[in-house]
Structure formats: structure tokens, C-alpha cells
Curated annotation (Swiss-Prot):
Keyword Nucleotidyltransferase among record annotations: no
Catalytic class of the enzyme: transferase
InterPro entries recorded: M28_QC, Peptidase_M28, QC/QCL
Originating gene: QPCTL
Keywords: Acyltransferase, Disulfide bond, Golgi apparatus, Membrane, Metal-binding, Transferase, Transmembrane, Transmembrane helix, Zinc
Name listed for the protein in its UniProt record: Glutaminyl-peptide cyclotransferase-like protein
Pfam families xref list: Peptidase_M28
Gene Ontology terms: cellular component: Golgi apparatus; Golgi membrane; membrane
Disulphide bridges: 167-191
GO molecular function annotation: glutaminyl-peptide cyclotransferase activity; zinc ion binding
Length: 382
């Protein structure tokens, strides 16, 4: 484990160096007759540099043949916003969705299978008619072969583009005899948030599906995020590595593959402790981070957030302390735009037996659910 980290190597993945700004020319007095040609030359040079730098930036950030669409979305009218927030049910989130997840659910364990079946059954019960798939596989681990299974739910698999929300549902393995670790923030709460969002927006999502909206919602519940022995490239991210590779090979119309249908990949992790702070990890998706920040401000001004004394508490400006290896990495490496919603610094209960329901902060959980619900409604035009 490295200081200040998540027990994971702090690699600056997905980042690029910034080009040095052009130095302004030294000021001097020029003959009047040469001024116009010089200004024209500077204008042409500036235009050329702007075009070149924009092209160069795109070639650094995007793999060949991949384009980044920038959807035009508007803010919800206040009445509609209040209706969306009012459809969320804090009691349902906590009792119906969160508590069944608060069990030991290490990969290959009975608890892991129990939670996987719960996720599948819950998603299949929604009236919007989600297309639910299981991605089972066996992987070699330091403990020998282990069975894993990702749950993939797509509202409308025929849609051209996907807004993908993801989290991991496995819990970290501790030595025999250790206090049971249920990973409330890591990542039972993110899983419960996704289920509550899908249920609360069920009618709106059903309507969007019937209207064949070009962008649909996709939910990924990933297995095997945690290392089974010691974090490394071959002992971590089992589910996301397998699923990203699989999605890269499955055709999707208009194509070419499922992974290229992902318009934005939002990964939720380490949520539920009091006073979380989030930072934008990737310049490519900073506009969506700013959108979440704006929604937090707006909900605060409308008195729709609890235990929220300041206008902005969660979505902070500035640089994160460092990059974190998490389930977004296999997708990021394939050119998928990533918005990483992980609390940094990590919660004090991280990877300790204290990461339980009693140490969660319900107002924070419900506030994040409201912010995400408004974000989904605006992004998808619900």
C-alpha cells in the first residue's frame, strides 16, 4: 500500500501533458508600412496553430475512428426537477436495496451469488423492461481458478448510444478469522443508488424506450474489483477487464462494437460516508463534472438537500490528489470517456471492518441520489 492511496498503485492513466503556451513577442515599435502584413501573418499563424492543436489534442485523447459526441442538454424546469426528486424513496433505497447487499460477498462465495441473483431479480422486475445479461467467467487468481459474474442491464439494447453507470458489487477478501467485511461504502451504497435510480425513474425510462430515444441508460454491476491477495495488474479488476474485452468484440449498430456505444462511463465508488469530496479526474469529461456541481448548487438553493450547509460541498474545483486504479481503467484504455465519482480522500472506514451500515451518513447518501437523479433526467431528456 502506498501512502495516500487506495492500496492501489497511483498511476496517472488517461492524462496527457499540456502544451506550453506560446510566448508573446517582445513589444517594440514597428514601421507603419509593415504593420498590416505582420498582423495578417500572425492571424494566419494563429488560426493554423488553433486547428493543429485541436487536431493534435483529439489524436492524443481518442483512439483512431472514435468520436466524442457532445450532447446538448438543458436544465430541468423547477417543477419537473421537484417531481424527479420527489419520486425518490429514501426508505426504499435503504431497506429494499441497500440492506440485502450488506453481506460478505467475496468472489465465488455464497454471499456473492446471493447478491448477484438479487441484482438480476430486481432489474428484471422493473416495468421498463430492462435487457438483463449475466457475464459469467472463470479467471486464474493467486488463489486458483475463481468464478466471477458481471450483471449488465441495458434499457434499450437497440439504442445507438449508452450512458453507462457502473459500480462493483464484490467485497474485499480478508484472512480467515477476520471480522466480516461488508463494504458498505465499498461498494454496497453505489449498487443501491443505481437500483433506486432505475426504480424511481421507471416510468420515464419506459417512455423513453418506447420513443426509441437515441441514448439509453445502461447499468453495470461488476464482480472482482478487489484484489484477492495483493493489488496488481493480474490481481484486480477481474470483472471490468473481462467485460471491457468482451464488449470490444460484440458488434453493435451503428457500430462497430458495444464498447464504442458507450457515450459516457460513470463509475461510482466509495460513497456513503459523511462529507465526501469529488474532483474531475479527466479533462475530457470535465463538462459533466461541472454539470453535477451545478445540480448540487441548484438543489441546495431550492432546499432539496439535507445536512448541506454550503452551496457546494461535494463537487470541488481543482485537481485530484492523484489518479486511482479502479474499474474504469479497462474502459479508459479503450477510449471510453470516463467520469469517476470516487470520494477522495477515501473514507476513514475504507478497507476496515468499520465500513458498515452504522457508519454511513444517510443524508449524504440521499443527497447524492437526488443529484444523480436530476443528472440522469437532464442527460437522457426524461
Amino acid at each position: 500500500m502506498r501512502s495516500g492511496g487506495r492500496g492501489r498503485p497511483r498511476l496517472r492513466l488517461g492524462e496527457r501533458g499540456l502544451m506550453e503556451p506560446l510566448l508573446p513577442p517582445k513589444r517594440r515599435l514597428l514601421p507603419r508600412v509593415r504593420l498590416l502584413p505582420l498582423l495578417l501573418a500572425l492571424a494566419v499563424g494563429s488560426a493554423f496553430y488553433t486547428i493543429w492543436s485541436g487536431w493534435h489534442r483529439r489524436t492524443e485523447e481518442l483512439p483512431l475512428g472514435r468520436e466524442l459526441r457532445v450532447p446538448l442538454i438543458g436544465s430541468l424546469p423547477e417543477a419537473r426537477l421537484r417531481r424527479v426528486v420527489g419520486q425518490l424513496d429514501p426508505q426504499r433505497l435503504w431497506s429494499t436495496y441497500l440492506r440485502p447487499l450488506l453481506v460478505v460477498r467475496t468472489p465465488g462465495s455464497p454471499g456473492n451469488l446471493q447478491v448477484r441473483k438479487f441484482l438480476e431479480a430486481t432489474l428484471r422486475s422493473l416495468t421498463a423492461g430492462w435487457h438483463v445479461e449475466l457475464d459469467p467467467f472463470t479467471a486464474s487468481t493467486p488463489l486458483g481458478p475463481v468464478d466471477f459474474g458481471n450483471v449488465v442491464a441495458t434499457l434499450d439494447p437497440r439504442a445507438a448510444r449508452h450512458l453507462t453507470l457502473a459500480c462493483h458489487y464484490d467485497s474485499k477478501l480478508f484472512p480467515p478469522g477476520s471480522t466480516p467485511f461488508v463494504g458498505a461504502t465499498d461498494s454496497a451504497v453505489p449498487c443501491a443508488l443505481l437500483l433506486e435510480l432505475a426504480q424511481a425513474l421507471d416510468l420515464e425510462l419506459s417512455r423513453a424506450k418506447k420513443q426509441a430515444a437515441p441514448v439509453t441508460l445502461q447499468l453495470l454491476f461488476l464482480d472482482g474489483e478487489e484484489a484477492l491477495k495483493e493489488w496488481g495488474p493480474k490481481d484486480s479488476l477481474y470483472g471490468s477487464r473481462h467485460l471491457a474485452q468482451l464488449m470490444e468484440s460484440i458488434p453493435h449498430s451503428p457500430g462497430p462494437t458495444r464498447i464504442q456505444a458507450i457515450e459516457l462511463f460513470m463509475l461510482l465508488d466509495l460513497l456513503g460516508a459523511p462529507n465526501p469530496t469529488f474532483y474531475s479526474h479527466f479533462p475530457r469529461t470535465v463538462r459533466w463534472f461541472h454539470r453535477l456541481r451545478s445540480i448540487e448548487k441548484r438543489l441546495h438553493r431550492l432546499n432539496l438537500l439535507q445536512s448541506h450547509p454550503q452551496e457546494v460541498m461535494y463537487f470541488q474545483p481543482g485537481e485530484p490528489f492523484g489518479s486511482v486504479e479502479d474499474d474504469h481503467i479497462p474502459f479508459l484504455r479503450r477510449g471510453v470517456p470516463v467520469l469517476h465519482l470516487i470520494s477522495t480522500p477515501f473514507p476513514a472506514v475504507w478497507h476496515t471492518p468499520a465500513d458498515t451500515e452504522v457508519n454511513l451518513h444517510p443524508p449524504t447518501v440521499h443527497n447524492l441520489c437526488r443529484i444523480l437523479a436530476v443528472f440522469l433526467a437532464e442527460y437522457l431528456g426524461l
